[in-house]
Amino acid sequence: MESGRLIFSTAGSGAGQMLFLDCGAGGGGGGVGGGAMFHRGARPVLGMEEGGRGVKRPFFTTPDELLEEEYYDEQLPEKKRRLTPEQVHLLERSFEEENKLEPERKTELARKLGLQPRQVAVWFQNRRARWKTKQLERDFDRLKASFDALRADHDALLQDNHRLHSQVMSLTEKLQEKETTTEGSAGAAVDVPGLPAAADVKVAVPDAEEPALEEAAAAFEEQQEQQVKAEDRLSTGSGGSAVVDTDAQLVVGCGRQHLAAVDSSVESYFPGGDEYHDCVMGPMDHAAGGIQSEEDDGAGSDEGCSYYADDAGVLFADHGHHHHHQHADDDEEDGQQISCWWMWN
């Protein structure tokens, strides 16, 4: 090996640089192998073997950093390249036009910008990831604003619901109180303990009408007494076989006195009274010695009938009912004595 020759070599992948300096055969200085001196150069900073151990990667990394690191690791041992503002502006404008990168478009952009197609593809990929992140952020902000608005509306509706519920409860209580008060006032109006009965109420009557009212009251009482007596006479003694109704009048004539009684819709108190329906016991004719029919011409009909005194007595005896009615009224009208008579329907 010639003296003063400097040899620089790289032995193997990742072996580092080797510097060999030959100082000649008679040169001074200690060394190995006749004054030969070996000097090992420094290893490269970004070596493949020590790259993973010497460089510490942060725990949280963005997709852009990962892609750039992967891309530039492939470019070793070349230097990491930065894009100029003009290149970034052109790429941004192209991304706004179309966010998807076709192969022809990628090659054209790389030629215009003086970059490799791989660099253009990585930039578009990173830019698309950032765009999606921004889009998600905008969507989240919009949805959050909508949620806040709906939450506020929900709270307002709940407050209105509580307010309306309280109003309904108060109105219901007032209505119940009003109904209770109305029922109490109605009951008090119907039954007032301090008011007198209707029979005890006295009506003020003028003095001029008092005699007429007294006479009417006396006549009414007398009529009631006569009606009671007539009912006693009409009763058969069996305790209720004779029925008296208010639909018709049974007139008993004794002189000038007339008694109003009722019996039309029920059976006659005589047994077998259906046979003698519409028969009348009229004034007795003393000359003929019998009882005339109610018809003026004296001719009997199928419905009406005429009985004589003896026959009438036999009729009453056969049915088991004996009714004795005597009336001694001495009053005479037109010189003739008027006997008592009965009439029924």
Curated annotation (Swiss-Prot):
DNA-binding region (UniProt annotation): 76-135
Region (Leucine-zipper): 134-178
A Pfam match: HALZ
Main location: nucleus
Region span, Disordered: 220-241
Keywords: DNA-binding, Homeobox, Nucleus, Transcription, Transcription regulation
GO-annotated molecular function: DNA-binding transcription factor activity, RNA polymerase II-specific; sequence-specific DNA binding
GO CC field: nucleus
Family as reported in the entry's similarity comment: Belongs to the HD-ZIP homeobox family. Class I subfamily.
Role: Probable transcription factor.
Name under which the protein is recorded: Homeobox-leucine zipper protein HOX16
Organism: Oryza sativa subsp. indica
Gene: HOX16
